Amino acid sequence: MRSATEFWRDPRTPFVESRRACDSRACHRPHSHDTFSIGAVDAGNSVFTGAAEGPRLLQPGNLVGVPAGRVHACNPLPGQVWSYQMLHLDARWMAEVRAEHDGLPGPDWLQEPIRISHHRPRYQQYCQLNETLFSDDPVSVKEAALIAFVGDLDEHDGVAVAGPPEDAALQQRVQPVMDVLRQRLEHTPALQELASLAGMSRYQLIRAFRRATGLTPHAWQIDQRIQEARRRLCEGQSLAVVAHALGFADQSHFQRVFKAHAGATPGQYRR
């Protein structure tokens, strides 16, 4: 059984990217996106990690909404395959659409909880939208379908399984570390340097950073590298250029890390 993965994006609609995967065995490391992501399970079962109370089993017809920056992963059961779809939407664009729909300020999708929905009509609407995005329909038709879907979304759809980080003071303390890691993607600063920025010991920083982000400083920076790699690949940069610019040892190293986070090779993603 061969798996198949395809991506859709259009420079005329930069606020959305979509993906379809069939009979996939690919597993993802815990990661995040800089978009609001909505995933749908089409076939097979998978395990979602990122919920406050531990892993959650997902079944066909389930939707999962994950706000930007939330660390999560969704993988098939051991030895099994699954099929799924994934939409990545710009959160600010979503809020603008909801404001148009309601005549009121839209919800802050960056602060929404992670939600799992079992609502079959919403899943069917999602599938119809994705069929349209991957079709040869005019971009105006695709944009209209997308606006209708987002406008119909209820921020209370589904069950909330994880809220946004609640410790604002902790977030403030590790923010300088996050800024440095994001600014210096081409290499990893020493842990002691990062700890000094936060006024903590190395051990304290690792614990605090994981509480604030869900990842260690090193893992978080790798996640940021992959997010930047996706942007650069969409711009048409070569794999070799991206690998070098983001501090990977070589192109092979870049491909391994990218696939572990994205569930697809850089070449598959760039097509």
What are these regions (language model features)?
Residues 2-107:
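N-terminal regulatory/effector-sensing and dimerization cores
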Residues 105-123, 127, 131-198, 211-223:
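Short, Lys/Arg-enriched, Trp-marked, Pro/Gly-tolerant hinge/linker segments that flank
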Residues 179-192, 200, 210-255, 264, ...:
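Terminal helix-turn-helix DNA-binding modules in bacterial transcription factors
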